[in-house]
């Protein structure tokens, strides 16, 4: 059930936004010039919110406002406006641990209007678009690996006291509406004939019906849905894919954490890996040059290996040097370094398995379920698109059903190459 709409709430437009902002912006984030002269455009291309660019004489800012329904689903899919507050709070938490080198600055939040203003990122572009274009980013793996390590470690029981962790869990437990969307769209609907499913038909019909009859895969999906619902390990971004990352050659910013909540670490990691694999399998639809395509596919696979390597290295370093955190208490290992390393190895082995399952779940969702990805959906030749998707579905099943057999990320990318 959605919350009641505040009496002062109203959706803003390009015409009404300047007047609203004129009395609320501080000098440090003021666009400059007269409000009536600001250039305002609505650029939201996501599923949830209105996104405005406000350009003045001195500065450009972003304003993001939640609507009382899912933008991609219309007024027939109501949603609480409180999701704007959750996104704002996740951005603040992420900036606390990952810093503004990876997280955009937020200028102010208005709960009654379900709106916040934030830094305009330029010349950054959405990563997904650049992956379609076949562009490489030398800092990407280092930045995303560090983002994952800092945010997941520092909001977990390993990195914070039990009291702090439980308070954080309580704060984000109320973001249940967006969690329900994830529970439905990723963990449930791709595995039966749900109304919102949207696959390449009829070319992929046989593969989709095979997935619906795959009891072994469905059992794993249900088990990981339960883990998603019950394992409050750390504060997640909740929707970490290439559409939630903006990049330049030298800078990376993670955006759009409105799905943030306390959940299993492997969900964020798996989402990102799954999207890199989708980009990998989509390449025949975007580049007919075999040598160039193979080179870029290798770069995509190495992003998976390198991101995991950076993540585990940074996470382990934070763990080694921690000064608080009630899980794996420091006192237990002061005289036994080998025991700590063994505990860490076991932790990462479990996390790898869970991350791979989640990667496969994300891949299935994007091919069979609601809200697919541009790198596949925009391949105009349906036979070619279906071929890419069929290979991706084969990989997804392998990750879901056989995750434990993959002992490292190198074995994962070798499996992808033979699909």
Curated annotation (Swiss-Prot):
It comes from the Bacteria. Substrate binds at residues 239, 365. Pathway: Amino-acid biosynthesis; L-methionine biosynthesis via salvage pathway; S-methyl-5-thio-alpha-D-ribose 1-phosphate from S-methyl-5'-thioadenosine (hydrolase route): step 2/2. The keyword Amino-acid biosynthesis applies. Its EC number is 2.7.1.100. ATP binds at residues 49, 64, 256-258. One of its GO terms (biological process) is L-methionine salvage from methylthioadenosine. SUPFAM superfamilies: Protein kinase-like (PK-like). Disruption phenotype: Inactivation of the gene precludes growth of the strain with 5-deoxyribose. Catalyzes the phosphorylation of methylthioribose into methylthioribose-1-phosphate. Also catalyzes the phosphorylation of 5-deoxyribose to 5-deoxyribose-1-phosphate. Part of a bifunctional DHAP-shunt salvage pathway for SAM by-products. This is Methylthioribose kinase.
């Amino acid at each position: 059930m959605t919350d009641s709409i505040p009496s002062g709430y109203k959706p803003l437009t390009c015409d009404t936004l300047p007047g609203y902002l004129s009395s609320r912006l501080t000098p440090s984030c003021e666009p400059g010039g007269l409000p009536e002269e600001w250039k305002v455009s609505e650029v939201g291309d996501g599923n949830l919110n209105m996104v405005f660019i406000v350009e003045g004489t001195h500065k450009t800012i972003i304003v993001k406002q939640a609507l009382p329904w899912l933008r991609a689903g219309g007024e027939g899919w109501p949603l609480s406006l409180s999701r704007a507050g959750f996104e704002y709070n996740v951005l603040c938490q992420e900036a606390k641990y990952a810093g503004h080198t990876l997280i955009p600055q937020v200028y102010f939040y208005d709960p009654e209007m379900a709106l916040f203003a934030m830094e305009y990122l330029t010349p950054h572009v959405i990563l997904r678009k650049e992956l379609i274009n076949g562009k490489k980013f030398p800092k990407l793996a280092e930045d995303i690996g560090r983002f994952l390590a800092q945010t997941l470690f520092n909001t977990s029981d390993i990195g914070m006291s039990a009291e702090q962790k439980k308070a954080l869990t309580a704060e984000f437990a109320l973001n249940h509406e967006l969690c329900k969307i994830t529970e439905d769209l990723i963990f449930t609907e791709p595995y039966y004939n749900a109304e919102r499913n949207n696959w390449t038909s009829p070319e992929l019909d046989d593969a989709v019906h095979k997935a619906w009859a795959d009891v072994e895969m469905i059992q794993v999906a249900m088990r990981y849905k339960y883990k998603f619902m019950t394992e409050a390990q750390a504060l997640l971004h909740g929707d970490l894919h290439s559409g939630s990352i903006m990049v330049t050659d030298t800078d990376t910013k993670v955006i759009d954490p409105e799905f943030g909540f306390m959940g299993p670490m492997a969900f964020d990691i798996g989402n990102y890996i799954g999207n890199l694999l989708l980009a990998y399998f989509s390449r025949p639809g975007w580049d007919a040059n075999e040598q160039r395509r193979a080179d870029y596919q290798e770069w995509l696979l190495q992003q998976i290996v390198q991101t995991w390597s950076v993540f585990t290295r940074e996470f382990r370093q934070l763990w080694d040097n921690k000064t608080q955190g009630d899980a794996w208490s420091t006192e237990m290992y002061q005289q036994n370094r080998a025991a700590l390393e063994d505990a860490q190895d076991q932790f990462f082995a479990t996390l790898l398995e869970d991350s791979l399952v989640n990667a496969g779940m994300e891949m299935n969702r994007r091919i069979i379920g609601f809200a697919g990805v541009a790198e596949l959906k925009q391949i105009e030749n349906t036979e070619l698109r279906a071929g890419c998707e069929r290979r991706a579905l084969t990989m997804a099943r392998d990750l879901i059903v056989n995750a434990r057999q993959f002992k490292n990320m190198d074995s994962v990318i070798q499996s992808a190459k033979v699909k």
